[in-house]
Regions:
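N-terminal beta-loop-helix "entrance" segment that forms/cooperates
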Residues: 39-65
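Accessory recognition modules or surfaces
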Residues: 1-8, 12-18, 47-57
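Active-site-adjacent pocket-lining segments in enzyme domains
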Residues: 5-37, 74-216
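Glycine/small-residue-rich loop that forms an oxyanion/phosphate-binding "nest" at active or ligand-binding sites
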Residues: 58-74, 79-82
Length: 216
C-alpha cells in the first residue's frame, strides 16, 4: 500500500493549516487506497489569530502540537521524515504554509523556508517522488525545484507574480483544476485560493490526490 507524507503547518486557516483542506486531503488519500502520516515543524507559530474575530492574540502556540489536533496525534516532527519510507508528499494550504513553513506572508518573493521543511521537500524532489501542494502552499514549489518549475495558486495576480519572481512559471487554473509539472513530478491546485465552500475545495483536492497516488 502506498504511503503519503503530509506536512501540516498548525491548525486553523489564519495561522496554521487550512483544516478543510487538510481533512479533505487525508480523506482523499485513504479513498484512493493509500495511507498517510502527518509531520510538522517543532517550532512556535509566527503568531496566534483569534479565528472568531481575526485579531492577533497575546499567546504562543507550537506548530507541531497544534497540527496534532488535525492528525489526531498521528504526527511526528518533520525533522524525522525519512523519504525512503514514503511514496509521495502532500502539503495542504492555510496561512501557516506562508507564515510557519516559510515567511512568504511577510517577505513575499524574498521569503525563506524552514530548514527541516526544505530538507524534507527537497528529499522527495531529489528522489523523483511526486509531491502535491494545495492553496498557498505552491509558493514553496520554486524554493524546492528551482528555475522554470510550473505550479498554480489559481489566478491571484500578485501571488502569481511573486511565484514568477521566485523562479517559477505560474499557470492559471480554476478551482476544480490541477496542474501537473511532469518534468518535476509536482502537482498543485488552487483549493481555498479560489474555493467559496468545502465542495469547491474538494473538487480540485480530490483530483490532485487521485493523480498523486496514481503516479506514486
Amino acid at each position: 500500500m502506498k504511503k503519503v507524507a503530509v506536512i501540516l503547518s498548525g491548525s486553523g486557516v489564519y495561522d496554521g493549516s487550512e483544516i478543510h483542506e487538510a481533512v479533505l486531503a487525508l480523506y482523499a488519500i485513504e479513498k484512493a487506497g493509500a495511507t498517510w502520516h502527518c509531520f510538522a515543524p517543532n517550532i512556535d507559530q509566527l503568531h496566534v489569530i483569534n479565528h472568531l474575530t481575526g485579531d492577533e492574540m497575546d499567546e504562543t502556540r507550537n506548530v507541531l502540537i497544534e497540527s496534532a489536533r488535525i492528525a489526531r496525534g498521528n504526527i511526528d516532527d518533520v525533522a524525522k521524515l525519512n523519504v525512503d519510507e514514503y511514496d509521495a508528499l502532500l502539503l495542504p494550504g492555510g496561512f501557516g504554509a506562508a507564515k510557519n513553513l516559510t515567511d512568504f506572508a511577510i517577505s513575499g518573493a524574498e521569503c525563506s523556508i524552514n530548514t527541516h521543511v526544505a530538507q524534507a521537500c527537497r528529499a522527495f524532489a531529489q528522489a523523483g517522488k511526486p509531491a502535491g501542494y494545495l492553496c498557498i502552499a505552491p509558493t514553496i514549489i520554486p524554493l524546492i525545484y528551482g528555475q522554470g518549475v510550473q505550479g498554480t495558486i489559481g489566478n491571484d495576480e500578485a501571488t502569481a507574480a511573486a511565484f514568477g519572481h521566485m523562479g517559477g512559471a505560474h499557470v492559471n487554473c480554476q478551482v476544480d483544476e490541477i496542474h501537473f509539472d511532469e518534468k518535476h513530478n509536482v502537482l498543485s491546485t488552487p483549493a481555498y485560493m479560489l474555493a467559496e465552500n468545502i465542495s469547491q475545495a474538494a473538487s480540485g483536492i480530490e483530483k490532485l490526490v487521485d493523480k498523486l497516488v496514481k503516479i506514486a
